[in-house]
Curated annotation (Swiss-Prot):
HAMAP family, per database record: MscL (MF_00115)
Name listed for the protein in its UniProt record: Large-conductance mechanosensitive channel
Top-level taxon in the UniProt lineage: Bacteria
A cellular component annotation (GO) from this entry: plasma membrane
Annotated gene: mscL
Native source organism of the sequence: Chlorobium phaeobacteroides (strain DSM 266 / SMG 266 / 2430)
Signal peptide: none
Family: Belongs to the MscL family.
Length: 148
């Protein structure tokens, strides 16, 4: 049983998946930093100096009466909030990650297409009956039409 587990654990697919998960976690940190520190501040400036991470709806006041200066102040007062600004940041992060993954997969598929390009086919289609015919054939074996 231990040998079977060892064979499973060191099999190529499991190791590849583990490496992918670790790289994905690191990539997520990079994207979150990109969104929170690079993308959102200019958008906030364009919208009048707004910080999206501080957008929230107050559901219930805390020990200190509202209004609160920021989401952090509301949370420290024990207020119950709906923090939709953090959700907006998460949605933007998701869109960036999916777009980068789309571009990555598209590039990889383009490279694979060049590698997987098949040589000229050994078969062509008969123009009369549409059946497959050898490229070397002078007549179609199905309809006996002469081929050029």
């Amino acid at each position: 049983m231990l040998k079977e587990f060892k064979d499973f654990a060191v099999r190529g697919n499991v190791v590849d998946m583990a490496v992918g998960i670790i790289i994905g976690a690191a990539f997520t940190t990079i994207i979150n930093t990109l969104v929170n520190e690079v993308v959102m501040p200019p958008i906030g400036v364009l919208l009048g100096g707004v910080d999206f991470s501080d957008f929230y709806l107050l559901l219930k006041e805390g020990s200190k009466a509202a209004p609160y200066e920021s989401l952090a102040a509301a949370k420290s007062a024990g207020a119950v909030t709906l923090s939709y600004g953090i959700f907006v940041n998460a949605c933007i992060s998701f869109l960036i990650v999916t777009f980068v993954m789309f571009l990555s997969v598209k590039g990889i598929n383009r490279l694979r297409a060049k590698e997987d390009a098949a040589p000229d086919p050994a078969v062509r289609e008969c123009p009369f009956c549409c059946s497959p015919v050898s490229v070397k054939a002078k007549r179609c074996p199905m309809c006996t039409s002469e081929l050029k």
